[in-house]
Amino acid sequence: MKMRRLLGASAALVLAISSTVASAEGKAVTIGYVDGWSDSVATTNVAAEVIKQKLGYDVKLQAVATGIMWQGVATGKLDAMLSAWLPVTHGEYWAKNKDLVVDYGPNFKDAKIGLIVPEYVKAKTIDDLKTDESFKGRIVGIDAGSGVMLKTDQAIKDYGLSNYTLKASSGAGMIAELTRAEKKNESIAVTGWVPHWMFAKWKLRFLDDPKGVYGAAETVNSIGSKELATKAPEVAKFLKNFQWASKDEIGEVMLAIQDGAKPEVAAKDWVTKHPERVADWTK
């Protein structure tokens, strides 16, 4: 998930969604997602595949901005979304729309942001960076102004890392730096989050954050419109049951997409390979 500062949707964009998201007739649902978030793409496509295969619904996926996704579900123009980071990241959206939507619970637990390192480095906590010269006084970040970058600026101050520089980059740039470091077995600290496909590719861990700068773990929740339970009761029941078991499980799908598979193909392959998980979700 690209942890960008969340922006409110404009009235014009809200009107735009009404023209692109039509109310489907019969057994059909429309689900919103954020195209730039790898976890949103993976989770939404897997859910859509299960809903189509096992519940017999047509599913339309609508890529929208975060604010429009929330407003779309709140107004019933979208039937559901599976990308609500709670209670903090999307806290303002929840506060504004909680009486207009239904929370079907988490589809991923222990979502979090922070500083990530390869398992082979010696540092265990952010505080350890102060005396560990192997990192060469550098933390590799993503987009300047994103939530995790703002928190990292704060962490540098709170932990007294005056000898460190936070390098703004992009998601792709951060991954490129991590790839190079992994190949050379070098120390590197990057800004990141789970769920993310990089945890399926490499052995990584978060540096402990005893000061709590990055906050506690969150959950990624499935949110439905008020009308969903009446319109599509089987889908509503599925959303209550749908939950990833671990970051490695969703990581399989995200990594397949990162390696070039189309999201719908990666989702279909995963559903085919894991019938027992699908059975748990649809019982």
Question: Where does each model-flagged region fall?
Answer:
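A conserved helix-loop-strand patch within extracytoplasmic ligand-binding domains
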Residues: 98-145
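Gram-negative bacterial Sec-dependent N-terminal signal peptides
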Residues: 1-23
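A ligand-binding cleft/hinge motif common to bilobed small-molecule-binding domains
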Residues: 82-97, 180-205
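Extracytoplasmic "Venus flytrap"
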Residues: 26-45, 66
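Immediate post-signal peptide segment of exported/extracytoplasmic ligand-binding proteins
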Residues: 22-31, 130-136, 276-283
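Short helix-initiation/N-cap motifs at beta->coil->alpha
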Residues: 37-38, 60-72, 166-177
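Short, polar/charged alpha-helical segment
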Residues: 38-57, 156
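A bilobed periplasmic-binding-protein/Venus flytrap-type ligand-binding module shared by bacterial periplasmic
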Residues: 112-122, 218-232
